[in-house]
Amino acid sequence: MAKTKSKKRKQAQAQAQSDNPRKVAKTTSPSIPTPPPDGTTTHFEPKNLHTVVSEEELEITIDTLNSLTQYPGLIKSKLCKDLRVAVYDFRQACTTGVNNAAGANLTAQVTAALADRKYTEARILLAEMKIRGEQPKLGALCRWVRDLDVISGLSTIPDQQGLVKRSEREETLIKVIDAVLRVCGHEDRNPNAIIQPSSIALQEIWDLRPDTPTEQVYASVLDGSLVASAPESLKKNIRIIETTPGPERKPPNHHDAILYASTPEAVPLSTTPPSTTHRPHPVVQGLSVATNVLYPEECKAIIAAGEYVNFVPDAPLREDGDISILAHNFYWVVDKTFHDTLWSRIQPFVPVSMNGRLARGINRRFRVYRYVPGAEYRAHIDGAWPPSGITKDDKYVYDDSPAEKKQSSLFTFLIYLNQDFEGGETTYFLPAAREGILNAYPVRPVMGGAAIFPHGEINATLHEGTGVRKGAKYVIRTEIEYDVEPTEEVKI
């Protein structure tokens, strides 16, 4: 019956095409010779799923398979013979998942299990990796965390009151990411960690804000006074140096990526540095916060620059057609004077050397973000960046490190530009004493302060930008750069 219906549908489609004189193949400039040259075969690989099957056909197929899954006895029936063959062929053709990981190493098997959403198998494989003392490479680690796409839900509980309600699948994902962190050697050694009846145990917020009135920066953005009061030197000395169309971005986006540059007159930093203090986090290894890195007026000048040129939404293209705005951004390559002044302020508080790799400076490519309620940066691990720059003819250079002395970042440098909002903590996750549980350590943003923590090859830290509940949060993401090759003898 299924074959008959399919045949009738195809015949009807063919008849409709022959009855419609407007659908005529263009032959004026064919992309391929027809017929193709002797001895050659041409294979077309569709780029879009909808060129092969319609969205409706795909939905019907998924619904049919899900329905039959509930009744395994029916799948064995004679009527399902052709379906079983088709499903087998589909599975054999699939280039992802466990089917293609047979005989591969444990890292590849975990990747395949996650692709197939076989989370129990993934946890078993991760346990084996831990027993064998194997650790995933950074690329695999970042991919696993990205694929799991864990949502903490912490922004839904104001003032740390109450527990987050999670679905069974969300609880499972947290258990898997806990296993991932344990394989990498992460653990919470805090004997006084708060225990909660939840898969994510929220710990006390680390709050270094001074006991002084908070500047209402976002209110001045909304009423237009912040940009209106910005000096003309800002408006005259900021320019676009590169635009990447949305579809060409990685991953593709609904909006273009616009890269700005500025002269030293645009956003000048004071030559008299503020009184910066630096404190390591009491629990999270490698995490520290420096306060008074920027003056409040310097923070507001950066926000004014972003608002003047307009923050651009970050909305990745999705196959399902949904639009999810992560944040609004302002990409800015700071001038050399700005870099040198800021580096002189923060350099005393970063490790001079990591395994013989010397610290060299800050990545001049600043990603300035504006977060509002509904936009949050889910749990992730930061990747490493080279130091970016600008050529003499005003061209952007992704990797501007010296050819003979390549550099790459080892620390994230997260600068907070305001604090007049609710929520919006930067939250760090560690495996708790009990397996399957994560302890969450929130850090409250301080205007003009900066969080510094490891990424890349050195003890990369799982963290999130917890959602803002009220107001708007402005923050800069950049990196601390180090030599790729060690130049000092590493003492053992």
Name the predicted role of every residue range.
Residues 2-450, 456-492:
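Fe(II)/2-oxoglutarate oxygenase catalytic core
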